[in-house]
Amino acid sequence: MKIAWNEMKYQPKKFILIELLIIILMFMVVFLSGLTNGLGRSVSAQIDNYGALHYILSTDSEGIIPFSTITAKDLNEVKKIEGMDYSGLSIQRATVSKTEDSNTLDITYFATDHNEEEILNPIMEDTDLKISDLKKNEVILDSSFKEDEGIQVGDQVIDKTSKQKLKVVAFAKNAKYGYSEIGFISSDTYTGMRQKTDPSYQWRAQTLVTKKSITSSDLASNLMVTDKKQVIDKIPGYKAQNLTLRMITWVLLLASSAILGVFFYILTLQKLKQFGVLKAIGMSMSQITYVQLSQLTIISLIGVLLGLGLATMMAPFLPNSVPSFMTLKDNLNISVSFILTSILCGALSLVKIKKVDPIEVIGGNGE
C-alpha cells in the first residue's frame, strides 16, 4: 500500500486524468440513480410515506386502488374481524384552479374516513394538523402548490368538475401519486363534490387501510389484501419505468468500469519497464499484484468519494421540476459496486504484467 501511494505522489500527472474520469463517471451514475428514485417518488411518494400498511381491495381491481370498490356488505364483513381498525381511502384524479378563469392544475384527491385508528396522515409542513381535523370543503395540498403556484394557507382553489370551492388549510411534504400532486380531503367533502354531478352518489371507499397483519384468507372471496410494495408496483407505469431506469443506471456503471479498465491497462503498458525492473530485483508477482490492487483501490476510493460528494452537494440546488431523491442505501450499493467493478476491470492488466520478461523489457525489446 505504501509503495502504491508513494508512486502516486511521485508521479501525480499519470493518475490525475484517471481520477477525474472516475469522479465524472461516478457523478453521472449517482445523479442518474437520484433521478430514477425521484421519478419513482413522483409516482408513489404518498403510499411510501404511509409506511408498512395493509390495503384491502376488491379482487377485480387487480391490486390497483382506483379500480377497487368496497361495498357496504364488504365493509360489514371486515368489521367482524377481531381488533380490526381501519381507514377508508378513495383516490380520484381531477383538476383545480385558483380562479374561474385561471389555468387548470392537475391534482389527485385522497379522500379518507376513519374507523378507530387514524393512520392516513401525510407528513405535514409547519403544522400538527391531522386529516381528522379537516372540515367540509377544506383541503390539504402538496407543498409544490405553494412553491410553484404561489397558493397560500387561507386561499381557495376551485374543483373544475363540481365548481366546489375548497379552502386551503395546510400543506404536506412530498405528497404525490401517479405523477400528480395530492389534495387531501374528507369523505364528506368528496361526497359533496360527487353529488353535484351525481346526486345519487354515496361514499364508498376504494380500499380499507389497516396496520393489522391480515391475509386474504381472513377476508371474503371477493376481497384481497396487499402491502405497500405491491400497491406501488401496481400503480400504472411505475414498474416498467423503474425497472428501465435502474437497468440504464447499472449498465452505465458497468460501462464506466470497463472504460476505467481500459485506462488502467494503458497505464500498465506505460509501466512495463518498471515492472521488469521490479521483477529483476526480486519482487514476486504476488507483491506486484498487491501493489497494483492497492493502487486501484486508492484511486477508485478517492474518485468515488469525490464523485458522490459532488452529486450529493448538487442535489439541493436542483429545481423542483427535476425530481431527484438520493438514498443512503442506493449510494452505498453504487459506491461499493463501482469500486469492486473498477478493481476487477483494472486487475485484468495483471495478465500483461505476469508475461513481462525482465531481460527483454530492461533490454528495450518489450512492448
Placement of each model-derived feature along the sequence:
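Short helix-loop junctions at transmembrane helix boundaries
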Residues: 290-291, 297-364
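Alpha-helical transmembrane segments
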Residues: 14, 27-54
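Membrane-proximal extracellular/periplasmic loop immediately following the first transmembrane helix
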Residues: 45-96, 106-112
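Small-residue transmembrane helix packing/gating motifs
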Residues: 88-92, 167-212
